[in-house]
Amino acid sequence: MDSSLGAIALGFVFGLQHATDADHVVAVASIVSRTGRFASGALVGAFWGLGHTVTIAAAGMAIVLFNVTVTPRAGLSMELAVALMLMALGVARILRLMREREEAPGQSVRGHGHDAPGFWLVLRTLGPAQAARSTLTGLVHGLAGSAAVALLVLSTVRSPYAAVAYLLVFGLGTIAGMTVITALLSVPFAARLPILFRFRRALALGTGLLSLGFGLYLAVHISFVDGLLLGR
């Protein structure tokens, strides 16, 4: 029992580490660059982590409890979906920047009054579209990583109940880790200094190009090096 509890607790640490995967950080960076508040940036990570946890837990439980098998080809297909999503996020960010006019600093963040306290004000500032985008991104990432996480669970704990607990604690770790990451990423976009306005736009463009380029690299690697489109 003690060893199982230790393994479950270790799942939180692995979840924190998992949040730092390059494709995860690149994806959320392009979303965070759309926000203009520190708290909103942190919420991007929280929603991403929520979506990631839902699919990791659901798919992981199916694998652990019902012996559902994920074939190598299916795993590569899910990873390709992540690559295409990264490309889409990058293109969307670049196109939005191209449409935006040069605005005076501070005009791009809309006020919402003071009728909603604390968390709800921050949530309204983030907006439903950004919350949905963050959650969907996490869902896709979680689906692609579910097989690997399930194998990690099977090699760590034996009891099915402990395995389920591990998946949930792992999910909490990814939520906590990504919330911290996106909060830090949001700092330059939340700064209100006029001198940083052009820098923020350049940084936002950089996140879009990075997401597009990294997604393209992954797509080519998965399709041809790993052999998804070659039938290997």
Give the location of each predicted region.
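Membrane metalloprotein/metal-transporter helix-bundle signature
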Residues: 1-232
